[in-house]
Amino acid sequence: MAASPTTGTDGRPPAPTGTASRRLALGALLFILVGWSLTGLDITVDRLLGAPGDAWDIFRRMFPPAFAEAAERGVVGKVFESVHIAWIGTLIGALLSLPLAFLAAGNVAPAWVRVPVRQLFNVIRAVPELILAMILIPVTGLGPWAGALAIGVHSIGTLGKWATEAIEGIDEGPLEAVAATGGRWASGMRWGVLPQILPVVTSQWLFRFEINVRASAVLGMIGAGGVGSELVSQLVFRNFPAVGAVLLMTIVVVLTIDTVSAAVRRRIIQGAGR
């Protein structure tokens, strides 16, 4: 029996024609783009080869960490200031994003409302927290309030998108039941949607808080409060033992928050599934 013209001699479909040439072209394009990027960043082979040794030298000079000096400079307070910035920023994002998410969901909001709100979320997410903080510092002045506002604004975009997706994935039975009894739109959101999404949204808020703790440490480098300012100060003076102490304190706090938050989120999701 003759082989089908659409299959190979072993019964499998033949490989698409031109696959090898396309892969070669993509590989060449990737190589060109990498080379172009390295050239644009003024990165040479010597610098690449020397980077691991330089990094190891700095890392080695951080030990033993100068915890006593860091404590005298109030680094512990700065670390917790970063946590406070992240918490207030997350709270701002959570409180403002949830109402907006109801206006952005395709199954509960009309298009003339939904489209602008979704675009607002996109615009907010497109601007990093660092840029937002630089914009806000002339308004609020240097300090943690600028960092908290920057994190809060950026969290609105991310949390709003996540909450919108949660609303669009609900079971619409309770919503239809509220409408059948003559309930208004707000009643449908309160009794038909909110109970379904609240566990998911709460876990999203906690996850965003974990992200914001790390972001708040970076914002301090431009004067927006937190431990980042202390880290920059020690790096400028090349006080590497103090840098090591600051980094280790920050890492311990961040890992602790991540572990506790992950456990709480797991309990919330498991409770919602029962």
Predicted regions and their residues:
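Membrane-cytosol interface at the C-terminal ends of specific transmembrane alpha-helices
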Residues: 142-208, 259
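Transmembrane-helix boundary motif in ABC transporter permease subunits
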Residues: 88-121
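Generic hydrophobic transmembrane alpha-helix motif, especially the helices
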Residues: 121-155
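N-terminal, non-cleaved signal-anchor transmembrane helix
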Residues: 1-91, 103, 107, 269-274
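Alpha-helical transmembrane segments of multi-pass membrane proteins
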Residues: 125, 154-157, 251-258
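C-terminal transmembrane helix and the adjacent membrane-cytosol boundary/short C-terminal tail
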Residues: 203, 244-274
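Pore-lining and gate-forming transmembrane alpha-helices of multi-pass membrane transport proteins
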Residues: 81, 85, 220, 229, ...
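Alpha-helical membrane-interface segments at transmembrane helix boundaries
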Residues: 76-84, 117, 121-124, 206, ...
